[in-house]
Swiss-Prot record:
Its cofactor is Zn(2+). Belongs to the PyrI family. Contains catalytic and regulatory chains. Involved in allosteric regulation of aspartate carbamoyltransferase. NCBIfam families: ATCase_reg (TIGR00240). GO terms for biological process: 'de novo' pyrimidine nucleobase biosynthetic process; pyrimidine nucleotide biosynthetic process. The gene is pyrI. This is Aspartate carbamoyltransferase regulatory chain. Binds 1 zinc ion per subunit. It comes from the Bacteria. GO terms for molecular function: metal ion binding. One of its GO terms (cellular component) is aspartate carbamoyltransferase complex. InterPro entries: Asp_carbamoyltransf_reg_N, Asp_carbamoylTrfase_reg, Asp_carbamoyltrfase_reg_C, Asp_carbatrfase_reg_C_sf, Asp_carbatrfase_reg_N_sf.
């Protein structure tokens, strides 16, 4: 008989980002500026997962992520789920899908890009090449980079 015990405290109301790949939880906290709130945030790192082997989880009380925020999670956590909780019950489960653009959360690898020298939010257009590799094109400097290159700059 398997005992199912919560390893991260339940929240009464808010958003739960589950199935985050291990070691990505802290990165999401800073990139999405989740810590710039007065809301209580609980994070579980390197937890056991049947689906991923290991996972991270983030719970944000009294905050419901927008569809735009959820979809931008997909660049880092394509198999994540976002659960909306009300009165300790799951009321909605959302699966992120890659948006056409990623705004504000990524840094352009081009050191000459205007976004690296002025207070301008970054913006990338997601593109797929002929080999189905995901590339990101900066809206400002118009340079195109492999997804892996952009994510390594963060």
């Amino acid at each position: 008989m398997e005992i199912n015990k919560l390893q991260v405290e339940a929240i009464k109301s808010g958003s739960v980002i589950d199935h985050i790949p291990e070691y990505i939880g802290f990165k999401l906290l800073s990139l999405f500026r989740f810590t710039e709130t007065e809301k209580r945030i609980t994070i579980g790192l390197n937890l056991p997962s049947k689906k991923l082997g290991r996972k991270d989880i983030i719970k944000i009380e009294n905050t419901f992520l927008s569809d735009e925020q959820i979809n931008q999670l997909a660049i880092y956590a394509p198999h994540a789920t976002v659960n909306y909780i009300n009165e300790y019950n799951l009321v909605r489960k959302v699966f992120p899908t890659l948006p056409k653009t990623i705004d504000r959360i990524l840094i352009c690898p081009n050191s000459n890009c205007v976004t690296n020298h002025h207070l301008i939010n970054s913006s990338f257009i997601l593109k797929e090449d002929q080999f189905f590799n995901m590339n990101l094109k900066c809206k400002y400097c118009e340079k195109e980079f492999y997804k892996k290159i952009v994510l390594s700059c963060q």
